């Protein structure tokens, strides 16, 4: 399975404390209509940390059902417990996901050997395509390029990585060490074009929740050799990307989607609504982009 182009790390719409299935299905449908290249439910942006196990399964199940094979679904299945990650991966496989996204274990800060053994054990237990997810700013641990290459060499089920270290040297080394068949996706909306320029294949994006056509257009333009168009889209996306991270993700992106009329704004504690000045700033950016 090829995971490339722009994949949306899709939000989980909530209403009265429950998953808003109607809004979620409508959002998925709009994403596909706008030309997105894949969907990633139950990631950080989908508030996976505060979903119950039952809700986690429902979010993935609904996404797969609504997509109906039109674009790849890469289901979030990570945990800081290897055993729990195996269970989440098994569910994703049984539900019909095209692959699973596995974040590096967080909080318990495993060594590089521990990271290697974690991914190896999951793949041995549940055989399916995996994309690893390196985001040291959230997990407290960085997976080095050497460890990524070791996993790629020994664990064929691991077909790529979502790289959100914001370290272009490390990303370049991963591409160098792992070769062109290893799918390296940006996990940072600000570094999509630089990552593509050194051999990456796309992005798992937050900002594409609100502008799927623009982010998929950037990736398509680059792949087609239209570097001028890709650069133009990169700069058009930059103000929106900054706005998506003016507070903790996914607070701004869910607020933006609410302003656009695509969902009711509801977050789960400890996430709280935006500060008034930041909300005003966000609305201004969306207005300039013609989104509200």
UniProtKB/Swiss-Prot annotation:
Q: Where is the active site?
A: 133 (proton donor/acceptor), 162 (schiff-base intermediate with substrate)
Q: Which SUPFAM superfamilies match?
A: Aldolase
Q: GO molecular function terms here?
A: 4-hydroxy-tetrahydrodipicolinate synthase activity
SMART domains, A to Z: DHDPS
Instruction: Give me the reactions it catalyses.
Output: L-aspartate 4-semialdehyde + pyruvate = (2S,4S)-4-hydroxy-2,3,4,5-tetrahydrodipicolinate + H2O + H(+)
Q: Is Cell membrane included in the keywords of this UniProt record? A: no
Q: Where in the cell is it found?
A: Cytoplasm
Keyword Amino-acid biosynthesis applies = yes
Which residues are the signal sequence here? none
Q: Where is this site: Part of a proton relay during catalysis?
A: 44, 107
User: Any one Gene Ontology biological process term?
Assistant: diaminopimelate biosynthetic process
Q: Which domain of life is it from?
A: Bacteria
Name the keywords, alphabetized: Amino-acid biosynthesis, Cytoplasm, Diaminopimelate biosynthesis, Lyase, Lysine biosynthesis, Schiff base
> Looking at the UniProt record for this protein, which Gene Ontology cellular component terms does it annotate, in alphabetical order?
cytosol
Which E.C. number(s) belong to this protein? 4.3.3.7
Q: Which Pfam families match?
A: DHDPS
What family is this protein classified in? Belongs to the DapA family.
Protein's job: Catalyzes the condensation of (S)-aspartate-beta-semialdehyde [(S)-ASA] and pyruvate to 4-hydroxy-tetrahydrodipicolinate (HTPA).
Q: What is this protein called?
A: 4-hydroxy-tetrahydrodipicolinate synthase
